[in-house]
Swiss-Prot record:
It comes from the Bacteria. Pathway: Purine metabolism; IMP biosynthesis via de novo pathway; 5-amino-1-(5-phospho-D-ribosyl)imidazole-4-carboxamide from 5-amino-1-(5-phospho-D-ribosyl)imidazole-4-carboxylate: step 1/2. InterPro entries: SAICAR_synt/ADE2_N, SAICAR_synt_PurC, SAICAR_synth, SAICAR_synthetase, SAICAR_synthetase_CS. The keyword Ligase applies. One of its GO terms (biological process) is 'de novo' IMP biosynthetic process. GO terms for molecular function: ATP binding; phosphoribosylaminoimidazolesuccinocarboxamide synthase activity. Its EC number is 6.3.2.6. This is Phosphoribosylaminoimidazole-succinocarboxamide synthase. Disulfide bonds: none annotated. It catalyses: 5-amino-1-(5-phospho-D-ribosyl)imidazole-4-carboxylate + L-aspartate + ATP = (2S)-2-[5-amino-1-(5-phospho-beta-D-ribosyl)imidazole-4-carboxamido]succinate + ADP + phosphate + 2 H(+). Pfam families: SAICAR_synt. Keywords: ATP-binding, Ligase, Nucleotide-binding, Purine biosynthesis.
């Protein structure tokens, strides 16, 4: 078997040349980093769980008309995706104050925001991925005004869908990170969702206990990272799919408008 050509290795994934033109194989690692890679470690089985969760979320998003780079899962750690030109912007969607916004603005962690907030960060590890405004994006031509309209619109739609999906399994979607890319068709291009969606890039809190089910367990030395990631997959019905011949699933997705108040309710502090 011929050796695959590695294209890029990041903090959580390795990209290989795909079997067909315009495709890439995305390999999920167990490596974990935080604070712009100042903290490094390993979460056992993380790559397998993230591959499965990301496949599930991207597939469901495609069903509501969100264009994505995902093609299919190849094995436990790899998926085939469409090659695209990554837009150098991290899009962070926030429903509840946590992490950097609490530190920057002095908002208590766990306080619901008045409305969903979209933030943009410039993707550059050497600069610490700084927070930027849409004026920066336009000034430096990182994305066109039309692309930014598409990105913002998709981000809100993704948030509404995912918040409902997680609310259905008693998980509060606090915030999450998205990345987008361009694909070209002759002289025209369009924006698609890229990268991954998993507990690595989402803050997910149990609605009843407030327990963190995401990478904050690694950031804050809480322990139990593997168990938390597995719990998210279990609630989504992904760990039982083999036994159900691939038909297992998370069940009904709640209507967002009917359950927004529950989503944003203040959780009970976790027991110590």
């Amino acid at each position: 078997m011929s050796r695959r050509r590695q294209i890029y290795e990041g903090k959580a994934k390795i990209l290989y040349e795909g079997p067909e033109p315009g495709t890439i194989i995305q390999y999920f690692k167990d490596d974990a980093t935080a604070f712009n890679a100042e903290k490094k470690g390993t979460i056992s089985g993380k790559g397998v769980i993230n591959n499965r969760i990301s496949e599930h979320v991207f597939t469901r998003l495609s069903h509501i008309g969100i264009p994505t780079h995902f093609i299919r899962r190849l094995n436990m750690r790899e998926q085939l995706v469409r090659q695209c030109e990554i837009i150098p912007i991290e899009v962070v969607v926030r429903n509840v104050a946590a992490g950097s916004i609490s530190k920057r603005l002095g908002i208590p962690e766990g306080e619901p925001l008045p409305h969903t907030l979209i933030e943009y960060y410039y993707k550059d590890d050497s600069l610490g991925d700084p927070l930027i405004a849409e004026e920066h994006i336009a000034c430096f031509n990182w994305a066109s005004p039309e692309e930014m309209q598409d990105i913002a619109s998709m981000a809100i739609r993704i948030n509404d869908f995912m918040a409902g999906m997680f609310a259905a399994i008693d998980i509060r979607l606090v915030d999450f990170k998205l990345e987008f890319g361009r694909i070209y068709d002759g002289d025209f291009s369009r924006v698609i969702l890229a990268d991954e969606i998993s507990p690595d890039g989402c803050r997910l809190w149990d609605m009843n206990s407030g327990e963190k089910l995401d990478k904050d367990r690694f950031r804050r030395d809480l322990g139990g990272e593997s168990e938390a990631y597995q719990e998210v997959a279990r609630r989504l019905g992904l760990l039982d799919e083999d036994r159900n011949n691939g038909e297992g699933g998370p069940g009904e997705v709640f209507d967002m408008s009917a359950h927004r108040s529950r989503l944003r309710g203040t959780p009970t502090p976790p027991k110590k």
